C-alpha cells in the first residue's frame, strides 16, 4: 500500500481496503468462433471475468450479469478486467449486460501491433517481424509507424511470407521486443521500400475485433476505465450507462509494454450516459505522426 502526500489525507484508521490477487479467468475462450451466452450471472473471479482471444471471434453476450454477490460489500468481485476481448477477427456483441466491481477495466477490446525485429541484410523491403498468427497474409497492405514518435514510416504490400522455425533465431528476434507483445516470427518481402527500422510498429489491420457492439449495458464501480478500446475498428458503443469509474472511456492505442492496438477508425459512440466518471480520453495520430 503506497501512501504519498497526494493521498495520505484521505486514508484513515478503520478504512476498508481490498488487495486482489490475480489468478485465472472465470471464462476463457481461445481460438473460438461465434460462442453465444444468454442469461449468465457471475459473482466472482480471481482474474478476469471473461477473456476471449484469437480466432474468428464474433461471440455474443446477452443479459450477462457480472457483479458482486447481493448482500456483500466487496470492493472487488473480479481480479482484473471484466470483458477482455483481443485479437479476434470479428469483435463481440455485448448487449443488455452488466459489469462491475473489477480490479481493472470493465470492458477492454483491442488488437495487437506487429513489430519489426530487424531488417534482413539491412534491406528496406526484406524484414524480420513478430506478429500474431494469421494477422499478416500475402497480398495484404500494411502500415509502419515509429514506436516512440508515432511518425509514419510507410505503406507496402506483403509479397511473400515465411515463418521462422529455428529456435535460436526466434529467441534472438524476440530479445528486444516489448514485454507483453508476443507472436510468431516471420520473414517478409514487401512490394516497395519503407523507412521501418528495428522496433517499428506494424499496423496490419487484421484481428483487431472489428465490428464490435456494446449496447444497452450498465457498467459501474471500478477505479479504472469503463471502456478501453485500443484499435478495434468499425465498432458501435451506444445506449450504455457508465457510473462510478476512474475514467469513463479511453479510446487510443498502447505502444508501451502491452502493444495493444492498433489505431482506431470508424468508431461510433452515441447516446451513452456517464455519471461520476473521470476523463473521457481520445488519442489520435495526425498525418505524419508526432502525437506525443
Q: Which stretches of residues belong to each language-model region?
A:
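Extracellular parallel beta-helix/beta-solenoid repeat domains
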Residues: 1-292
Amino acid at each position: 500500500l503506497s501512501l504519498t502526500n497526494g493521498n495520505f489525507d484521505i486514508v484513515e484508521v478503520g478504512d476498508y481496503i481490498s488487495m486482489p490477487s490475480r489468478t485465472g479467468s472465470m471464462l476463457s475462450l481461445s481460438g473460438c468462433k461465434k460462442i453465444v451466452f444468454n442469461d449468465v450471472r457471475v459473482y466472482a473471479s480471481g482474474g478476469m471475468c471473461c477473456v476471449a482471444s484469437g480466432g474468428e471471434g464474433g461471440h455474443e453476450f446477452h443479459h450477462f450479469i457480472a457483479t458482486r454477490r447481493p448482500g456483500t460489500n466487496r470492493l472487488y468481485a473480479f481480479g482484473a478486467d471484466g470483458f477482455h476481448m483481443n485479437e479476434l477477427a470479428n469483435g463481440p456483441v455485448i448487449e443488455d449486460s452488466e459489469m462491475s466491481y473489477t480490479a481493472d477495466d470493465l470492458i477492454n477490446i483491442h488488437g495487437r501491433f506487429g513489430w519489426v525485429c530487424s531488417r534482413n541484410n539491412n534491406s528496406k523491403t526484406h524484414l524480420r517481424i513478430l506478429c500474431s498468427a494469421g494477422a499478416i497474409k500475402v497480398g495484404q497492405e500494411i502500415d509502419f509507424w515509429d514506436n516512440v514518435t508515432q511518425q509514419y514510416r510507410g505503406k507496402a504490400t506483403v509479397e511473400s511470407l515465411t515463418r521462422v522455425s529455428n529456435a535460436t533465431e526466434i529467441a534472438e528476434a524476440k530479445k528486444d521486443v516489448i514485454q507483453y507483445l508476443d507472436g510468431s516470427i516471420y520473414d517478409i518481402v514487401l512490394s516497395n521500400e519503407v523507412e521501418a527500422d528495428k522496433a517499428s510498429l506494424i499496423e496490419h489491420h487484421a484481428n483487431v475485433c472489428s465490428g464490435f457492439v456494446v449496447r444497452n449495458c450498465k457498467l459501474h464501480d471500478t477505479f479504472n476505465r469503463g471502456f478501453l478500446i485500443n484499435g478495434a475498428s468499425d465498432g458501435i458503443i451506444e445506449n450504455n450507462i457508465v457510473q462510478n469509474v476512474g475514467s469513463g472511456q479511453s479510446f487510443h492505442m498502447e505502444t508501451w509494454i502491452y502493444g495493444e492496438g492498433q489505431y482506431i477508425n470508424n468508431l461510433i459512440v452515441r447516446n451513452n450516459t456517464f455519471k461520476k466518471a473521470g476523463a473521457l480520453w481520445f488519442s489520435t495520430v495526425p498525418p505524419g505522426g508526432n502525437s506525443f
